Design a protein with these regions (language model features):
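Catalytic phosphate/metal-binding cores of nucleic-acid and nucleotide-processing enzymes, i.e., regions
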Residues: 1-119
């Protein structure tokens, strides 16, 4: 059965809203309008961050809630929309966990920065 466009958009919007809520839950010093889910069909990042939010969460988020994800085209879209920020692809499918993907080298850089700040 093929999913209608409206249903697919609602499914994607639910993931965007969930990611927005998780970021706000993790960084409780942020205000609700520091992290916003974009309108479906808008170009650019799926979760918009204020400068205050960006300092805590330096990622450009692209959300995909699809049963069959083309990982390579999704990563390309994520990188295109990221601009100067760190591209982060967040994805899930029905009844699955939510996963996040970023370039491995960038992950190592972030871990290195984190270890330097804790020394």
């Amino acid at each position: 059965m093929v999913m209608k466009t409206r249903s697919a958009n609602n499914k994607g919007k639910r993931l965007q809203n969930n990611i927005r809520d998780l970021i706000l839950e993790k960084f409780q010093q942020l205000e609700e309008d520091d992290v916003r889910s974009t309108t479906m069909g808008d170009s650019g990042e799926d979760v918009l961050l204020s400068p205050a939010a960006r300092r805590l969460f330096p990622f450009a988020v692209e959300c995909k809630n699809q049963e069959k994800l083309n990982i390579w085209s999704s990563l390309e879209q994520t990188e295109t929309n990221a601009g100067k920020h760190i591209p982060l692809l967040v994805f899930k499918r029905n009844r699955s966990k939510t996963y996040a993907v970023l370039e491995f080298g960038k992950l190592l850089e972030l871990l290195d920065e984190d270890s330097e700040s804790t020394q």
